[in-house]
Amino acid sequence: LAFILFTGGGDKIRINHITNRRWALSAFGTASAAALSSSDTVYSVTPIHHPSGLLTSIGGAVAGGARLALATRFDPTTFWDEVRRYGVTIVSYTWTLVRDLVEAPPDPAERHHPVRMFIGSGMPAGLWKQVTDRFAPATVLEFYASTEGAAVLVNLSGRKVGSKGRPLPGSAEVRLARYDTVAGRLIEGPDGFAIECDVGETGILLAQARRASGIMAVTPLRGLFNRNDAWIATDDLFHRDEDGDFWLDDHVPALIRTAQGTVPSVPIEDALGRLDEVSLAVAYGVASPAGDDEVAVAAVTRSGGREIDPVTLSEALDRLPAHERPVVVHVVEDIDRTAWFRLRKFALRQAGLPGGGEQFHLDQNSGAYDTSS
């Protein structure tokens, strides 16, 4: 089994070659990680034209011998009735898909539900916590996969909410290399080779290129750590904790380039998303009124119409380094999403600094947020 995926949009469409080996790795990896068997029913509510639908939900069900239930679209109002009707034990997701389920009023069919696991990729840390709190004992199995680089990470235990976990057995070896986010290149040591990151240090994720791995749209980088190696660079920045678990910091194109240096957006979004009052959060850069650089801005939606307290907001963002905090957090009615429920930042970025509505501004002296401008 092999196929070609077209991702992106406009003039930036990318062709991704999914070989039989790549499909099998994802399919059998999912089946193993989720312990899928003939007693399971996988409910694929994700768009099947998305890699997660083809490789994870459908592939995992086939490899694990589980039943597969397909939906024409995701509808929170009928979701739990369908779960009961089909005996669903596994639910697939992409990005913020289950947000609408969490925001929906409690459903009688939700009580003592049969779902034991939500599997997918891209779930924000705040939403992850809401899912496990509301739908316990169901857990979240979060994957990260580069489409062609064979880098596959999985958070098997689910204990570290927001972590992408560790490399899936059988997938390519991965390393983090020091990366100059300003110059956009790897940092080399005195010997001319790339430098592997220390624990807690952010770097670019590399996947070792496999020999005879089929057609690749990305040319491997050769001679990075020694003269004979070959690696495929992702566009993703991670750090690794003391236990060996990987945490996504940002995608290189999404970095916010301020006068104080580059600022990753994911830590801002995670800090805001963990607030009970926040449903969705995005961080992005807009042109600075004072120069050619950017300033960090965040947009949030309320959870259940709750009011956001400036003190609580300040405490949440106080965990970030001072130069990485957004200068303004503004409340919006909703945040646009793609067909597979990924949050869109383009329109917000194009709009520039927010001109009205509820806003919280950073006091550069105190480090606190208040509603004054």
Which residues does each PLM region occupy?
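Gly/Ser/Thr-rich phosphate-binding loop
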Residues: 63, 85-93, 102-180
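AMP-binding/adenylate-forming catalytic core of the ANL superfamily
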Residues: 91, 145, 203, 207, ...
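Acidic/polar alpha-helix N-cap and adjacent early helical turns
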Residues: 336, 350-373
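Conserved pre-ATP/AMP-binding loop-to-beta segment of ANL
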Residues: 1-6, 12, 19, 35-41
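Conserved AMP-binding/adenylation subdomain of ANL enzymes
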Residues: 24-41, 49-89
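Short hydrophobic/charged patches on amphipathic alpha-helices used for structural packing
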Residues: 77-80, 107, 269
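Adenylate-forming AMP-binding core of the ANL superfamily, especially NRPS adenylation
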Residues: 123, 160-219
